[in-house]
From Swiss-Prot:
The keyword RNA-binding does not apply. This is Intimin. It is found in: Cell outer membrane. PANTHER family: ATTACHING AND EFFACING PROTEIN HOMOLOG-RELATED-RELATED, INVASIN. The lineage of its organism: Bacteria, Pseudomonadati, Pseudomonadota, Gammaproteobacteria, Enterobacterales. Belongs to the intimin/invasin family. An inverse autotransporter. Residues 1-41 form the signal peptide. It comes from Citrobacter freundii.
Length: 936
């Protein structure tokens, strides 16, 4: 039996000691009086259990005999009729050779077969009585008693004799000590406990090996019990069962297994099968293992296979759990020259995405660990060890241990003598050792789908259009908020915002302007958060902006580009155009696309082409005349064609402009914002430096009309304007008389918000924002400039929210900044300052008595209106309350007014209606006549 990790607390220590002593006393009485019930006809069981001369020197039908003066092994062999080979077979682990055993001197120990000596020892006297003088028998032992005397030793006599002995001993101690009654009681109980322990040991030694680990703290968490029971045992084969139970990490786990061990002259091979059951977490696992042992060496391999699937975790919130599949390989070795010193090596590996190999708070994918350790056994009873484990994630454990290895089949003297450590390391000494395996179930975890979100459809729409976003949100604890990252969309003037309902999952997308030649595809991400702070995965929404000529929700061209900007005007060099056709963001195959030359002289390879499996249709263009060409593409469902950027066919024998580009197509008409034009001049396929380029425009102001190319053949100019309008810039070189035109650009007036043109929705009055607010009252801002297509956002929607038309709803007292972005990517802001007061209707459905209304206002750090004039002022600034969506269902919003001293004495008050302006006096305060309308 191995007992390790045993500790006790100081609390209830006295009660625990008494409990164990009383239990021991009862067991002692049971075994002392009923010891003969264990007799089975074998001589061993007939020995007196209270004869310490025998009990301390016998084990498993063997006598551990100490040679006396003048005795030798040869004499014992002759006098007892035991052959020397039989004696040598029992003493191989004590002596290096048979000759060394024969030389054993007085004081040394020899193991003899107990059954051969049963006649001499079955009638030994009880310790404490007068011994019979030995004659011609083993020295130090008694002679046979007479037959009559033997017959008188019945079980009742033995019990009475033992009781008399212990009573005499107790009386002697009481005579020699002046102690209280507790000492007498404890001494008596201790004697009975010792007897129980002795009898229990004699009984348990026939039932295998037990390992106990008790932790008295933390409700015995960490405690375990394992028991190996041989049920068929021969010299060459052992069949056994093993049971175990443990309470670790607040989980109760049981293990049930069976196996066989086959013993060869120098080694052992074995196998075992286990079922592990976690009763707390309802997890089941199968274990299959193999063993190979030799003297001073043990090895084992174990495989672990789950038998239960995913289910809610027993002690890890918001997770599911199941056993992890895995294996381990273990090696234990000891030095034959110094068997007290041993080493350990183990590798373990488990499989799963979130396996808790180390603890439930540290989860790893397919983790593994290597354990190395050393141990020291100074005497068979005690083993001390230190293990170091290193595993996945750079996890490290350093474990110290001390084990107490109590063997029921060995006398106490053998368990505290260093010379007997060697036997533990042999096959015969470890025959009944427990299976080396991991009895704890290693678990694999999976985060529950407590919060998930998805968008079933991406968005495709024309520039500046508004689209409702369909969100599907599943939340275990309720949705708190959704956070969007629409930065890429905002840079072009679009945004994601709440729709008018302002529910947690009610959003809409406002698309930016279409960028000619750009990708016009935006990736927007969002993440949901629940009321417990959990977050969902990032979900991506793809928004595709189409030009006004394209058709949403129909088969249309989303992109039309050329593979190069110029080609030789030799009627051979070609430019390839690719049109991409999609419907709702999905590529469409087998769709006819028609192509047409909008301007210039050139030849298309085909007037139409069908899209391939990727939704792409291609056509080539060639020309034998220098000049600029524009090509368009269209599907049958499109209302207008989509133009590609202009391309240029050049005469390579002359210096020619091969491309003209702009850095942007829109700018602010403030004489500061500029658009940069870049042209490239080449001749014979090489860039030309020092070439003069002449620029012209039909609108705006160029910073210069001539520019010279650099070493790479580039020349640049800039265009600005102080007035809104569209402009086309052209360029030409002296060797080619034809102008090359750039894409059309547009200048927009500077964007601004006039703070003196704030319109109150309920009255239609335009001016500055009133300093006293009606909660959920609305005003409309007016933006001017830009391209006239605006998107709005608020810095703090809890204070003030804004819709896509610039209508602001005042939600709470405070300040916020409203930003408007135009389609040409200009922005302007308007700051809402904290008002002097805000009128809040705490409850617009249920009328209440004056005192209740006053309490409701105080609960939100506000008060009832001090006078009717306060409410009249609100009405004059905001109009009837029911002109706003929040109050639209209210035909009346009668508000209590703060009582005067005389009103309070009379139990009355005044009211004012924010819908009808009806004013009443001397209204009975105890009746539910008005609403709780508060001033904050």
């Amino acid at each position: 039996m191995i007992i390790h990790g045993f500790c006790t607390g100081t609390r209830h220590k006295h009660k625990l000691r008494k409990t164990f002593i009383m239990l021991g006393a009862g067991l002692g009485l049971f075994f002392s009086v009923n010891q003969n019930s264990f007799a089975n006809g074998e001589n061993y069981f007939k020995l007196r259990a209270d004869s310490k001369l025998i009990n301390n020197n016998i084990a498993q039908d063997r006598l551990f005999y100490t040679l006396k003066t003048g005795e030798s092994v040869a004499q014992l062999s002759k006098s007892q009729g035991i052959s020397v080979p039989v004696i040598w077979s029992l003493n191989k682990h004590l002596y290096s050779s048979e000759s060394e055993m024969m030389k054993a001197s007085p004081g040394q120990q020899i193991i003899l077969p107990l059954k051969k000596l049963s006649a001499e020892y079955s009638t030994l006297p009880i310790l404490g009585t007068a011994p019979v003088v030995a004659a011609a028998d083993v020295a130090g032992h008694t002679k046979k008693m007479s037959q009559d005397t033997t017959k008188s030793n019945t079980s009742d006599d033995k019990a009475l004799n033992y009781a008399a002995q212990q009573a005499a001993s107790l009386g002697s101690q009481l005579q020699s000590r002046s102690l209280n009654g507790d000492y007498a009681k404890d001494t008596a109980l201790s004697m009975a406990g010792n007897q129980a322990s002795s009898q229990m040991q004699a009984w348990l030694q026939h039932y295998g090996t037990a390992e106990v680990n008790l932790q008295s703290g933390n409700n015995f968490d960490g405690s375990s019990l394992d028991f190996l029971l041989p049920f068929y045992d021969t010299e060459n084969m052992l069949a056994f069962g093993q049971v175990g139970a443990r309470y670790i990490d607040s989980r109760f786990t049981a293990n049930l297994g069976a196996g066989q061990r086959f013993f060869l002259p120098e080694n052992m091979l074995g196998y075992n099968v286990f079922i592990d059951q976690d009763f707390s977490g309802n997890n089941t696992r199968l274990g299959i293992g193999g063993e190979y042992w030799r003297d001073y060496f043990k090895s084992s391999v174990n495989g672990y296979f789950r038998m239960s699937g995913w289910h809610e975790s027993y002690n890890k919130k918001d997770y599911d759990e199941r056993p992890a599949n895995g294996f381990d390989i273990r090696f234990n070795g000891y030095l034959p020259s110094y068997p007290a010193l041993g080493g350990k090596l183990m590798y373990e590996q488990y499989y799963g995405d979130n396996v808790a190999l180390f603890n439930a708070d540290k989860l790893y994918s397919n983790p593994g660990a290597v354990t190395v350790g050393v141990n020291y056994t100074p005497i068979p009873l005690v083993t001390m060890g230190i293990d170091y484990r290193h595993g996945t994630g750079n996890e490290n454990d350093l474990l110290y241990s001390m084990q107490f290895h109590y063997q029921f089949d060995k006398p106490w003297s053998q368990q505290i003598e260093p010379q007997y450590v060697n036997e533990l390391r042999t096959l015969s000494g470890s025959r009944y050792d427990l299976v080396q395996r991991n009895n704890n179930i290693i678990l694999d975890y999976k985060k529950q789908d407590i919060l998930s979100m998805n968008i079933p459809h991406n968005i495709n729409g024309t520039e500046h259009s508004t689209h409702k976003i369909q969100l599907i949100v599943k939340s275990k604890y309720g949705l708190e908020r959704i956070v969007w990252d629409d930065s890429t969309l905002r840079t072009q003037g679009g945004q994601i915002q709440h729709s008018e309902r302002k529910a947690h999952n009610d959003y809409q997308a406002i698309l930016p302007a279409y960028v000619q030649g750009g990708s016009n595809v935006y990736k927007v991400t969002r993440r949901a958060y629940d009321r417990n702070g959990n977050s969902s995965n990032n979900v991506q929404l793809t928004i595709t902006v189409l030009s006004n000529g394209q058709v949403v929700d129909k088969v249309g061209i989303t992109n039309f580009t050329a593979d190069k900007t110029s080609a030789k005007a030799d009627n051979s060099d070609t430019i390839t155009y690719t049109a991409t056709v999609k419907k709702n963001g999905v590529a469409q195959a087998n769709v006819p696309v028609s192509f047409n030359i909008v301007s210039g002289t050139a030849t298309l390879s085909a007037k139409s082409a069908n899209t391939n499996s990727s939704g792409k249709a291609t056509v080539t263009l060639k020309s034998d005349k220098p000049g600029q060409v524009v090509v368009s593409a269209k599907t049958a469902e499109m209302t207008s064609a989509l133009n590609a950027n202009a391309v240029i066919f050049v005469d390579q024998t002359k210096a020619s402009i091969t491309e003209i580009k702009v850095d942007k197509t829109i700018a602010t008409a403030d004489n500061k914002d500029t658009i940069e034009y870049t042209v490239k001049v080449m001749k014979g396929g090489n860039p030309i430096s020092g070439q003069k380029v002449t620029f012209s425009k039909d609108f705006g102001t160029l910073n210069k009309t001539e520019a010279t190319t650099d070493q790479n053949g580039y020349a640049t100019v800039k265009l600005s304007s102080g007035t809104p309008g569209k402009a086309i810039v052209s360029a030409k070189v002296s060797e080619v008389n034809t102008e090359v035109k750039a894409a059309t650009v547009e200048f927009f007036a500077p964007l601004s918000i006039d703070g003196n043109k704030v319109t109150v929705i309920g009255t239609g009055v335009t001016g500055s924002l009133p300093k006293n607010w009606l909660q959920y009252g609305q005003v409309k801002l007016q933006a001017t400039g830009g391209n006239g297509k605006y998107t709005w956002k608020s810095s703090n929607t809890k204070i003030a929210s804004v819709d896509n038309s610039g209508v602001i709803t005042l939600n709470e007292k405070g300040s916020a900044t409203i930003t408007v972005v135009s389609g040409d990517n200009q922005s302007a802001t308007y700051t809402i300052n904290t008002p002097d007061n805000i009128i809040i209707a705490v409850d617009k459905i249920n009328r209440m008595a004056y005192s209740e209304a006053e309490s409701r206002c105080q609960a939100i750090s506000s008060n009832l209106a001090q006078s009717k004039s306060v409410l009249e002022n609100i009405y004059s600034k905001w109009g009837a309350a029911n002109k706003y969506p929040y109050y639209s269902s209210s035909n009346s919003l009668t508000a209590w007014i703060k009582q005067s001293t005389s009103d309070s004495a009379s139990g009355v008050s005044n009211t004012y209606d924010l819908v009808t302006t009806n004013s009443l006096t001397n209204v009975k305060a105890t009746d539910k006549n008005a609403f709780a309308v508060c001033v904050k």
